[in-house]
């Protein structure tokens, strides 16, 4: 086991990720150069904590090892959890989604959910993204000064996910708040008054499950044009989702489909503001440049910082002996800055090709199911912004989420010249 004096604070602590970006980048480069596969200790848990004490985890910081682990799910399993700290058993009922499963369970759920995305459903999604983006700009265009994350970046994926699942608008704020609690665990802004983080996360899962059960019950036997209706009424080779499957899938959509797109859009405005030459290249030929620009935003933003796997057998990775049962964490954000893969990796380049990033996860069965939708949302949102608020820019520094799992932006001030609403 490699034993090298690593940077401080520990990479698995949220304190590592709320520092100046230059400090984070310097330390990630240190890991890639000096200890690309290295073991770090987990924090000591209080004796009364329901979280089991873990020995530690292997950190993968280079692109090559992350691809190798992603392509070998039979050796690097998702079923024991996807975060560094193990969850209390009672959490599994709400958070044991397909992302934390191996085949054949993972393949079964993914197959059923994929079947729900019919051509008609996909067309509805395309139309919905355009309409929602236009409505969002209408809601802010006369203000001239906004919190870009709250008013724009978060509003789009939240509305799309809720519409997709048939969730009534009356629940939108509740869904948004629960998402913040689950993924912002530990950030002071989202801490409950009593400081009990685990209870807050558990209760957020309970609320989301209740919302989904209510929606699913209302869709039984109906012919509504949403994914929940398709999933509760359709059977695929005598197989269908249970209510627990449906609830955990909804939670996955809320936290993955909502938060990751929100953070990509939020970081995207920051990158475009800091790199006006790249912004102009995109504006000059939006449709042609959009595919590479969106991939570059996702690469640098890396909305999901890492994913954990667990070794199912003794193995060798990056020259290190990994034992059966060891945790292995793939730090996507570091891999997306790997100097061996990306030329000038810290440069924001909207024309970057090739761009073999792992911002949607590595290759293999767990590649992001919603990658196509996320790309579409990012493209449409920036098209609408460039067209109607052409001088919009970040007017301050992002307020970064204090979390190690999500590379999040909580708030980002933005300014633009006010314009009138569209008459539609």
Model-derived regions: residue spans:
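Cytochrome P450
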Residues: 1-424
């Amino acid at each position: 086991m490699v034993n090298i004096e690593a940077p401080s604070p520990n990479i698995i602590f949220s304190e590592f990720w709320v520092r100046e970006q230059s400090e984070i980048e310097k330390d990630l480069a240190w890991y890639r150069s000096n200890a690309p596969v290295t073991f770090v200790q987990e924090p000591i848990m209080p004796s009364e904590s329901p979280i089991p004490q873990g020995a530690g985890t292997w950190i993968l910081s280079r692109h090559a090892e992350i691809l190798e682990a992603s392509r070998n799910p039979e050796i690097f399993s998702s079923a024991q959890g996807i975060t560094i700290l193990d969850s209390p058993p009672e959490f599994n009922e709400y958070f044991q989604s397909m992302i934390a499963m191996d085949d054949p369970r993972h393949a079964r759920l993914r197959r059923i959910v994929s079947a729900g995305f019919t051509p008609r459903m996909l067309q509805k999604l395309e139309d919905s993204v355009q309409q929602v983006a236009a409505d969002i700009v209408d809601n802010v265009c006369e203000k001239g000064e906004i919190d870009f994350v709250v008013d724009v970046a978060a509003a789009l994926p939240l509305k799309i996910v809720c519409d997709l699942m048939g969730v009534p608008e009356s629940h939108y704020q509740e869904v948004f708040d629960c998402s913040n609690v689950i993924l912002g665990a530990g950030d002071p802004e989202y801490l409950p008054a009593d400081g009990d983080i685990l209870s807050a996360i558990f209760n957020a899962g309970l609320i989301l499950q209740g919302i989904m059960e209510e929606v699913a019950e209302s869709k039984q036997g109906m012919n509504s044009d949403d994914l929940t209706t398709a999933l509760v009424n359709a059977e695929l080779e005598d197989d269908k989702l249970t209510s627990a499957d449906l609830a955990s899938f909804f939670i996955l959509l809320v936290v993955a489909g909502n938060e990751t797109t929100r953070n990509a859009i939020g970081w995207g405005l920051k990158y475009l503001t800091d790199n006006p030459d790249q912004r102009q290249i995109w504006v000059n030929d939006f449709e042609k440049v959009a595919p590479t620009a969106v991939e570059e935003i996702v690469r640098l933003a890396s909305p999901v910082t890492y994913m954990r796997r667990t070794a199912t057998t003794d193995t060798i990775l990056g020259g290190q002996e990994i034992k059966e049962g060891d945790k292995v964490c793939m730090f996507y954000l570091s891999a997306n800055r790997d100097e061996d893969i990306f030329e000038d990796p810290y440069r924001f380049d909207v024309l970057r090709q090739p761009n073999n990033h792992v911002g949607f996860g590595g290759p293999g069965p767990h590649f992001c199911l919603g990658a196509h939708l996320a790309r579409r949302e990012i493209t449409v949102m920036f098209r609408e912004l460039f067209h109607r608020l052409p001088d919009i820019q970040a007017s301050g520094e992002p307020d970064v989420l204090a979390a190690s799992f999500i590379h999040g932006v909580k708030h980002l001030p933005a300014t633009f010249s006010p314009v009138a609403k569209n008459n539609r």
